[in-house]
Amino acid sequence: MGNIRQTHIKNIAFRLVENYGDVFTTDFDKNKLLVSQYTTIEGKVIRNRVAGYVTRKIRYPKLI
């Protein structure tokens, strides 16, 4: 079974990949820093979830 993510996490991640897709990599730690740069997310949990979803989308582009 896969992970079910909340809609707002998917929306933020989709917009980030759409606008800054060439900047993100398959490295989760780098993506955490980039998510902090490009968004106003203050919470660590939400930031990590968005960064994880972005990492997954970059790693498996056919899932976008």
From Swiss-Prot:
Gene Ontology cellular-component terms listed: ribonucleoprotein complex; ribosome
Record's keyword annotation contains Ribosomal protein: yes
GO BP: any one term: translation
A single MF term (Gene Ontology): structural constituent of ribosome
Superkingdom, natural source: Archaea
Keywords: Ribonucleoprotein, Ribosomal protein
Pfam families: Ribosomal_S17e
Family statement drawn from the similarity comment of this UniProt entry: Belongs to the eukaryotic ribosomal protein eS17 family.
NCBIfam families: PRK01151.1 (NF002242)
This protein's name: Small ribosomal subunit protein eS17
Organism encoding this protein: Methanococcoides burtonii (strain DSM 6242 / NBRC 107633 / OCM 468 / ACE-M)
Gene: rps17e
